[in-house]
Amino acid sequence: MRILAVEDEPEYLEMLQEVMNSLGHTIVIAPNGKEGLAVLESQTIDVVVSDVKMPEMSGVEFHRRVREHPEHRNTPFIFLTGVDDLTEVRAACKTDSDLLLQKPFPIDKLLKMFSGKMK
């Protein structure tokens, strides 16, 4: 599985890389939504994991732009967030392909999301 991780916090990127690589997945990293969109246009991606609060473009805006592409309308998308007010993120989660994981999170919860929803 090819996973796009759009995250500006190095510790979460490192953790995602470690866990996904150990499971045999390939992880592609983008530090912001703008670069994430460029990756989606140039590579095949099976799952998107994105922070909500990022520079240049919020995760919610990034999600909206991803969903504008017909080939990514149903690509599994996991929001990672440390914000307390989840109203905007929950409003963006419109399909079964959209998931939310609040930081900090236990690794087993992330693994459960991947094993259950991402097959």
Question: Can you say where each PLM-predicted feature lies in the sequence?
Answer:
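Receiver (REC) domain active-site loop signature in two-component systems and cognate sites
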Residues: M54
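Helix N-cap/capping motif at the beta->alpha junctions
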Residues: I29-A38, G59
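Active-site beta3 strand of CheY-like receiver
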Residues: T44-V49
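Short amphipathic alpha-helix used as the core "switch/output" element in two-component signaling
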Residues: A38, V60-R73
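Charged docking surfaces used in two-component/phosphorelay signaling
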Residues: E14-S22
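Alpha4 helix (beta4-alpha4-beta5 surface) of REC/receiver domains from two-component response regulators
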Residues: E61, D84-L101, D108-K112
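Conserved acidic carboxylate
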Residues: E7
